[in-house]
Swiss-Prot record:
Organism (species): Clostridium acetobutylicum (strain ATCC 824 / DSM 792 / JCM 1419 / IAM 19013 / LMG 5710 / NBRC 13948 / NRRL B-527 / VKM B-1787 / 2291 / W)
UniProt xrefs under Pfam families: Ribosomal_L14
Secretion signal span: none
A GO cellular component entry from the record: cytosolic large ribosomal subunit
Protein name: Large ribosomal subunit protein uL14
BP terms from Gene Ontology: translation
Oligomeric form and interacting partners: Part of the 50S ribosomal subunit. Forms a cluster with proteins L3 and L19. In the 70S ribosome, L14 and L19 interact and together make contacts with the 16S rRNA in bridges B5 and B8.
Name of the gene: rplN
């Protein structure tokens, strides 16, 4: 579960290393997000010379969640960390590489470019 103030690792090479969730998009009463949800976040740490800078407000899609996600067959998929990929307004990733595995549930939400860049889809 991702909510406001949650710190997430950035799983791409956009220049940000860590972001903090400001808002989960999808309605005024929405409190939590999970894998495949779009969030608004603030960059808390970044690498020098990257595309994004510290303090910048960005949109991101959650690709890994420690809470886990229940699949249709009854199984659960969960990860060791919370991670996100920074995206543009047209749902395309800002970076050119994705690090670590991502869940296949992103395909249902039309993040096919992220799936094609990922080294492993679980």
């Amino acid at each position: 579960m991702i909510q406001a103030q949650t710190m997430l690792k950035v799983a791409d090479n956009s220049g940000a290393k860590e972001i903090m969730c400001v808002r989960v998009l999808g309605g005024s009463k929405r409190k939590w997000g999970n894998i495949g949800d779009i969030i608004v976040a603030s960059v808390k740490s970044a690498t020098p010379g990257g595309v994004v800078k510290k303090g910048e407000v960005v949109k991101a899609v959650v690709v890994r969640s420690a809470k886990g996600l229940r699949r249709a067959d009854g199984s659960y998929i969960k990860f060791d960390e919370n991670a996100a990929v920074l995206i543009k307004d047209d749902k395309q990733p800002r970076g050119t590489r994705i690090f670590g595995p991502v869940a296949r549930e992103l395909r249902d939400k039309d993040f096919n470019k992220i799936l094609s860049l990922a080294p492993e889809v679980l």
